[in-house]
Amino acid sequence: VDMAISGLNKSDLILLAARPGMGKTSFALNVALNVAKAVHKTVAVFSLEMSREQLATRLLSSEACVENYRLKTGSLRETDWEKIAGAATILNKVDIRIDDNPMLSVADMNAKCRRIDSLGLVVIDYLQLMTSASGGRSGENRQQVVSEMSRMLKVMAKELNVPVICLSQLSRANEKRDDKRPMLSDLRESGAIEQDADIVMFLYRDDYYNCLLYTSDA
């Protein structure tokens, strides 16, 4: 991925889009962890869907190479404990700040990030859950709101001079096609997102649809 996009560049708005279940959050957390470890800067993660505890568990699972469900259920093997201890030591040395307030606007995030010294990366999970500056007045055109927020995210990336990775949901349009691979036209609720983003990346797993097809045929 680094070779394809030439790494994470300052002031870039990077859109990471996929259908639910493709691994957007896990991918973004891995990027966040790698940045925090490699450049020793603070990574701000705004999670509008999952709690701080859920994300912390995922980070620990990823670093320890222990299945997430084992951590959540406590069904750990004896060999897992040493891995977890080592991963916890590493995570304790990096500065990843998770804010799980589900009602944050772009302006709120910008203000919080400005108070962080040595900021290296911002991750937002995810665009369609964000609140507009007006607080979501009734009668608002959601497509216009999302378009406005994507523009504000680009402005934020430039003002903070750090890369901003924003996760986004896709519409169901790809599921109606024989070729399930996502396209720019599948971006949900906004035709302007691809104009504001410097990079648009899609996550796609062919086995996800093959598995569903096999199940339905059975």
Where are these regions (language model features)?
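Substrate-engagement module of ASCE P-loop NTPases
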Residues: 145-164, 189-196
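Cytosolic-facing regulatory segments adjacent to core modules
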Residues: 2-3, 26, 30, 34-118, ...
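Conserved glycine(s) of the Walker
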Residues: 23
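P-loop (Walker A) phosphate-binding loop of NTP-binding proteins
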Residues: 19
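Conserved small/polar residues in nucleotide/adenosyl-binding loops
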Residues: 214-218
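Phosphate-binding/switch loop-helix module in NTP-utilizing enzymes
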Residues: 97-156
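Phosphate-binding P-loop
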Residues: 5-10
